[in-house]
Amino acid sequence: MTMSLPTRYLGTIALTLALGAVFYIGTFLYQIGALVSAEYWIYDAQVVKHELLARNQDKNKLIFAAGSSAFFGIDSQRVEQALGMPTINLGLHIGRPVHFLLNEMTPYLKRGDVVVLPLEYEHYRATTPYSEWFTNQVMAWYPEYFWQLETTEKLRFLRSVLPQRVLLGVLAKLMGD
């Protein structure tokens, strides 16, 4: 049985697209964790804040979770002195989506804890949790976040990453980070 010209043409297009998708996904996965330009200080600060959460896990505590407005605008020590309750400020950067903020603190919460979310305007108007800034940070210094996502969320994440960023990560890996 001979295939008609349009069928062969469409088959060739479908095969090319499938091979292109497999190649792109492979390069995307290869470059995750590449040492590219990113805000690594946020990772370091996040580790410290998680240690504070763990240290106060069994106590009733007050937690502020937001972006840099909380980071720069809320003095945890003063709040703690005024209220007599351990206070932890998880504020770091506006680019961290709300679901990320919530997932970050949830393992450390217990009944009686108070969480305050003084969110920035951008948190309310974001159309996707995967901004260019956020995906770059995750791929550079927090690949565990990507790997723990459900498959459909991994695909949403992958679709939100610019091809130029994938290329940058591949080049960094090939050059030995």
What residue spans do the PLM features occupy?
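Membrane-embedded segments
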Residues: 65, 69-152
